[in-house]
Regions:
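A SIS-like phosphosugar-recognition module
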Residues: 1-194
């Protein structure tokens, strides 16, 4: 975007010597200006919601993290094991298509949807809200689950679907506490977890 290119130009003007572009197009303005490039090679994006590009960005950042981790002497074994499982997890999602279709009908006549995430799940909640808006024209907002009681909780009732990305780590207990508040207000909860 123009904002990204403008930021890179400003960094170059300020004499930042190490610039890295993570990009899908090898001959873009961004890649020409940047000192280093990490190409995603995802191919052209057809979808309005840009699902392939987003997924490729996540995967590329994961690979970059593994490379940097190795350079600092840390083991990237756990990350590599996780990367190897991605294909199988995607296949499992295809097998869940009937369940996903059934769940999707619960959003059909809704005017608003709330998405929650915490830690690494928060940006996923933001992206999921954006995808719902772009594809279905249903208003959606995403919040860090810890911010739920600072406004969004007041909107929750039996008509409000609340989608939560529940991390499988030390943050789960805190997120479950937030979901208890949603359920106390009869909000419809949909939980995605690993």
């Amino acid at each position: 975007t123009a904002d990204t290119i403008s930021s890179l130009k400003k960094a170059l003007k300020l004499k930042y010597t190490n610039t890295l572009a993570i990009c899908n197009v090898a001959e873009s303005t961004l890649t020409r200006l940047s000192g280093m490039n990490f190409l995603m090679n995802a191919g052209p994006e057809i979808s309005v919601a840009s699902t392939k590009a987003f997924t490729s960005q996540l995967f590329t950042l994961l690979l970059l993290t593994a490379i940097i981790s190795r350079e600092y002497g840390n083991t990237e074994r756990r990350m590599v094991q996780g990367i190897r499982k991605i294909g199988k997890k995607i296949e499992e999602l295809y097998e869940m298509e009937p369940e996903i279709k059934k769940i999707s009908t619960k959003f059909k006549n809704k005017e608003h949807t709330l998405f929650l995430g915490k830690g690494a799940s928060y940006p996923i909640a933001l992206e999921a809200a954006l995808k719902l808006k772009e594809i279905s024209y249903i208003h959606a907002s995403a919040y860090h689950s810890g911010e739920l009681k600072h406004g969004p909780l007041a909107l929750v009732d039996r008509r409000m679907p609340v989608v939560c990305f529940l991390p499988d780590n030390h943050l789960a207990r805190l997120v479950l506490s937030n979901l208890a508040e949603v359920e106390a207000r009869q909000g419809q909860t949909f939980i995605f977890t690993n």
